[in-house]
Amino acid sequence: MKNINDIEIYRITHIDNIPHILKNGITHKDSLKKNLNYKNIGDISLISIRSSKKIGVSNGKDNVVKEINLGDFIPFYFDVRMPMLYVIQHGGNYVENPTNAKDIIYIVCKLVDILSLNLEYYFSNGHATDYFTKFYDKTKINEINTILDWECIESKYWGGEENAVIKWKKQAEFLIKGDIPPKLIKYFICYDNSIRENLINFGISEQSIKIDPDAYF
């Protein structure tokens, strides 16, 4: 269990998108500031599914209190080294071209900083497109520590049928609707020192960059 003040959320992107993010922040797909030259690294089929998928927010109960469109929100994970990253790096599903770890950058924000924006947000207790996943709104944010399974989220081992539940819970998401200004980015994670130098050349301070090859596959 974590203190809400210590929770960080993570988003990965191609290094080519970083200059735009430094200037405009993490932008929503419908934002006036969106990156017209955005370089995608994700599973195009999953992106397509999410763009139109309706989900019910039930706050863990049987009755839906609100229906939202998953594709209207910017998704974050609660830790590094997610199953989707494995697919992005190695290919498979509908990832057209694998992406080298050196080209993948983590953008890390403090959850409490994001909450201060007062934007519409939700979070899930597992993979967002699985039918048995529950979604929660801001009325449950103070219970996030007990709703999420942190042992699963931080687990390094999730492969195989025997770990299906771990894999599902590991991919819990935080969803936010709207742009996140660059000042709320706490730090960046990259694969090695050569990429760190590239990020410094973009104008990112050394103190805001962490090298962590263990965050990759």
Label for each model-derived stretch:
Residues 1-217:
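Active-site-proximal loop/hinge segments that shape catalytic or ion-binding/gating pockets
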